[in-house]
Structure formats: structure tokens, C-alpha cells
Amino acid sequence: MALDTPLSRAPAIAPEPKGILDPATGLPIGATDPTFLSINDELADRGFLLTTADDLITWARTGSLMWMTFGLACCAVEMMQMSMPRYDAERFGFAPRASPRQSDVMIVAGTLTNKMAPALRKVYDQMPEPRYVISMGSCANGGGYYHYSYSVVRGCDRVVPVDIYVPGCPPSAEALLYGVLLLQKKIRRTGTIER
């Protein structure tokens, strides 16, 4: 005879993910983005788009960001979880690459020590322009728990320029995915072609 406990009656599958929502509006990320709203209006009005080369390149770059991991500690586990099927970062055009020469984005996840700082800079310098950095977790953002240690760099922004900071110890995969979407929004806002 089986025991009838709340745990034995619970479904054996994970609940449905709720999606990525903007905490300020409660709407999905990108629902109020002026770029997408203007594209929808123009397509509905004429049936085709007129655009500049800069806008086309910026649009293509935001939809095909290749990221490289620089996992130094426990935050790297959440970073790996973001690329797994439950969150599926590739549906946002954010795919992993193993080489810095093929990457647009570096995710620094974990405690950066003084000995590892030159390696971080060397890998960053090998990335092609334009390149972006996401600092993930309290340790990468400012030293975290080890802030006062003699061997820890108090934030990876002292070694490489950081575009997006994702707070938490460790931040969840949803938080990192939200940071990726914010990076895409930043790229759309600033453009990629230098004049």
C-alpha cells in the first residue's frame, strides 16, 4: 500500500516557465520597444520595410550574439542552466561559442583573482569588435563575499569594460537572461557602426 502524502501526489514534471517579464510594466520584454512597434506599424501599413544599412546591421547583430563563458566559480552553473532547454537562450539569438575569436559577448561569472586578471584581459583582447561584457554575480561585480581578500579583484570592471551587471549570489538563470535582453536593447539603442 502506497503512502498518500502531499509529495507523492505532486506531479512529476516541472511547472511551465512564466517567461521573461519586465518588472516595471509586467509585459514581456520587447512588447513596448519602439523599434519593434515601428516595424509592426510599417509592415501593417505598406507590407515592406525601408531602412538604413546601420539599422539593418544593428538588427542582425542583436539577433545573433555569440557568447563565450568565462566561468570562474559557482555562478557558471546558472550560466550553463540558461543555455539548457528550460530557458533556451538560443531562441533570443544568443548562442554559445568556445573561442573568443568567434564571440561577441563575454560573460564573467565568479570571483576574479589577481592571478586570473591578465588572462581575462588577454581573452577580452582576442574578441573581435564590437565586443560586450556581462558581469554576472556579486563576486564579478564587486568582489562579493571575498571583497576584502588580498587576492581578489574588486570587480571585473577594473580589468575590462562592463556593459551589463547582473546582481545576485548566484543570480538565477532568469536574471542572466534578462541581462542578455537588456544588452540587446542597449545594442539597438546605441548602434554598432562607428562613424
Swiss-Prot record:
Chief location: membrane
Membrane topology qualifier: Peripheral membrane protein
Record EC number: 7.1.1.-
Keywords: 4Fe-4S, Cell inner membrane, Cell membrane, Iron, Iron-sulfur, Membrane, Metal-binding, NAD, Quinone, Translocase, Transport, Ubiquinone
Residues that bind [4Fe-4S] cluster: C74, C75, C139, C169
Essential cofactor(s): [4Fe-4S] cluster
Record-level GO cellular component terms: plasma membrane; respiratory chain complex I
A GO MF label: quinone binding
Similarity annotation: Belongs to the complex I 20 kDa subunit family.
Chain's role: NDH-1 shuttles electrons from NADH, via FMN and iron-sulfur (Fe-S) centers, to quinones in the respiratory chain. The immediate electron acceptor for the enzyme in this species is believed to be ubiquinone. Couples the redox reaction to proton translocation (for every two electrons transferred, four hydrogen ions are translocated across the cytoplasmic membrane), and thus conserves the redox energy in a proton gradient.
HAMAP family tied to this protein: NDH1_NuoB (MF_01356)
UniProt subunit comment: NDH-1 is composed of 14 different subunits. Subunits NuoB, C, D, E, F, and G constitute the peripheral sector of the complex.
Name used for this protein in its record: NADH-quinone oxidoreductase subunit B
Species assigned in the record: Methylobacterium sp. (strain 4-46)
